[in-house]
């Protein structure tokens, strides 16, 4: 069976020593339900990853992005689905926050992030993002919702 490939962005807005995370608890049949993740979503046909990141941040948080940095790429592989995700850290933004229809937004101290329920694979790339590692690429292989392998390039 052919795997479906999706291209997405995942964005971590940084303020002082916190990241803005989204607790996925509002959508019906949400694959990410019960997890804390960055904000983001699918890249539209006419968009670059940067454009998608700016749009998704505005839609989900209300913030206006002035500059952004793509920190790396993560390929998620799970059964019949693959997702190529561009990971961003954003420090230059402003505006008034809005309620998100996908979950609850919260500024989480970076030192406490690992205490929140998240995908096991996120724990592989978040330290690279937090520590400003050079541009990273990795592949996270899941079976159902269990991480079974990590390949770093």
Where are these regions (language model features)?
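Conserved N-terminal beta-strand and adjoining loop/helix that marks the start
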Residues: 1-21
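Short, glycine/serine-rich, charged loops/turns that create anion-binding
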Residues: 18, 26, 75
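Short, surface-exposed acidic-centric catalytic microdomains
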Residues: 33-39, 47-49
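Unchanged
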Residues: 43-66, 75-129, 149-153
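Charged phosphate-binding loop/patch that engages nucleotide di/tri-phosphates or the phosphate backbone
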Residues: 131-153
């Amino acid at each position: 069976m052919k795997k479906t490939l999706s291209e997405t962005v995942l964005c971590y807005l940084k303020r002082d020593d916190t990241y803005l995370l989204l607790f996925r608890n509002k959508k019906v049949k949400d694959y990410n339900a019960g997890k804390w993740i960055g904000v983001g979503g699918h890249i539209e046909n006419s968009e670059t990853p940067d454009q998608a990141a700016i749009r998704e941040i505005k839609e989900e948080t209300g913030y206006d992005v002035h500059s952004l940095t793509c920190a790396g790429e993560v390929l998620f592989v799970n059964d019949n689905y693959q997702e190529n995700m561009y990971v961003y850290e954003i420090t230059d933004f402003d505006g008034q926050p809005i309620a998100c229809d996908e979950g609850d937004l919260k500024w989480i101290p970076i030192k406490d992030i690992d205490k929140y329920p998240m995908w096991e694979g996120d724990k592989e790339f978040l330290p690279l993002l937090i520590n400003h590692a050079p541009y990273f690429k990795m592949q996270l292989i899941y079976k159902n919702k269990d991480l079974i392998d990590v390949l770093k390039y």
